Amino acid sequence: MTVQQAFEQHVMHTYARFSVVFERGEGCYLEDSEGRRYLDFVAGIATCVLGHAHPVLSAAVAEQARTLIHVSNLYYTPQQACLAEWLTAHSAADQVFFCNSGAEANEGAIKLARKYGRTVLGIAEPQIICAHQSFHGRTMATVTATGQPKYQKHFHPLVPGFVHVPYNDFEALRAQVTDATAAVLIEPIQGEGGVVPGDVEFFQKLRRFCSERRILLMLDEVQTGMGRTGRLFGYEHLGIEPDVFTLAKALGGGVPIGALCAKEAFAIFEPGDHASTFGGNPLACAAALAVCQTLEAEQLVDNARERGAQLAAGLGRLVERFKPLVRTARGRGLMQGLVLSEPRAAEIVRLAMEQGLLLVSAGPEVIRFVPPLIVSAIEVDEALAILEGVFARLPVTVTA
């Protein structure tokens, strides 16, 4: 039985997978079971910030596995303490709750907001405002928070207590605020919603408004956090600090870990309020700490900013050459999106893969670029050249 046959027979069909089996990786490249190499601009969907088989991360995981993998949160472990110290020293947060994924981190934020609403604001049924086209996860609470009905189909009744408003529209958001509003949960850049950057003026107005109304401002940094945008956290581009923010994806460099981060005044969980069996285990924390230290040692946040500017400029040239099919490019750092005038993103992703470049869509009309933060100038140029070749051979059906 082949790998793909085993998947077909024994793995639930929750993904429409590409017909390729990856067996190894190094740097920004993956190699499939037939020995073919691919330039990886997906990075596990904005996760493998150090690329594949990075020696520091590999050594940290191997060494920790030889020492201690898991004991539960009934006890103290040095790896969790060190990681929490690093995150709070480098961010607006004072305290951290560790879990295993972005959905779990956002689930924790939702619970924190509800407790804040009930115990601090005295709201019997707290409400959370989210944005249309947002994505916060696939658990019942986070898929309800997600502002995309396609992810909610078949899963009603949804969790009550969520209101959705247009992204980057302060007046629309303010109009939905009531005495029951406890929090706003929003992304600095909408990732799955089409790589839509947050507007600075919107977020600064939102920050002031939330402070005035004692509403929690919670940022979902699952995709933007840990250097992806050319700053360590996405909120740094916006000139604000959140009360609460969530991390995952890049935090572990491919090892599952998530984090709910909060300022001390809002870190109101008590024993019994929330928990995670695996959250913050020594193995995951050792991996995440290696990622954090490597981001600094190799100046990868700076690299994300510089290579992001190079990528954005190259995408801009593609926009000019291939109009009207390609409408615009947008993003920050190494989180870029190429916006099409037709729903052909999946087709272009497939054609690019055939030419050895891995990309991922963000909706039917947006191609997303989220390479490892170690990506070089040569590799960015290689990706742009492959993509240019794909567009050059693509039949254009849009009329000017």
Swiss-Prot record:
N(2)-acetyl-L-ornithine binds at R138, S276. Its EC number is 2.6.1.11. The keyword Ribosomal protein does not apply. GO terms for molecular function: identical protein binding; N2-acetyl-L-ornithine:2-oxoglutarate 5-aminotransferase activity; pyridoxal phosphate binding. The modification N6-(pyridoxal phosphate)lysine is found at K249. It comes from the Bacteria. The keyword Lipid biosynthesis does not apply. SUPFAM superfamilies: PLP-dependent transferases. InterPro entries: AcOrn/SuccOrn_fam, Aminotrans_3, Aminotrans_3_PPA_site, Class-III_PLP-dep_AT, PyrdxlP-dep_Trfase, PyrdxlP-dep_Trfase_major, PyrdxlP-dep_Trfase_small. It catalyses: N(2)-acetyl-L-ornithine + 2-oxoglutarate = N-acetyl-L-glutamate 5-semialdehyde + L-glutamate. Its cofactor is pyridoxal 5'-phosphate. PROSITE patterns: AA_TRANSFER_CLASS_3. Gene3D superfamilies: Aspartate Aminotransferase, domain 1, Type I PLP-dependent aspartate aminotransferase-like (Major domain). Keywords: Amino-acid biosynthesis, Aminotransferase, Arginine biosynthesis, Cytoplasm, Pyridoxal phosphate, Transferase. It is found in: Cytoplasm. Pathway: Amino-acid biosynthesis; L-arginine biosynthesis; N(2)-acetyl-L-ornithine from L-glutamate: step 4/4. Binds 1 pyridoxal phosphate per subunit. Pyridoxal 5'-phosphate binds at G102, A103, F135, D220, E221, V222, Q223, T277. Its main location: cytoplasm. GO terms for cellular component: cytoplasm. GO terms for biological process: L-arginine biosynthetic process. Homodimer. May also have succinyldiaminopimelate aminotransferase activity, thus carrying out the corresponding step in lysine biosynthesis. Belongs to the class-III pyridoxal-phosphate-dependent aminotransferase family. ArgD subfamily. This is Acetylornithine aminotransferase. It comes from Gloeobacter violaceus (strain ATCC 29082 / PCC 7421). The gene is argD.
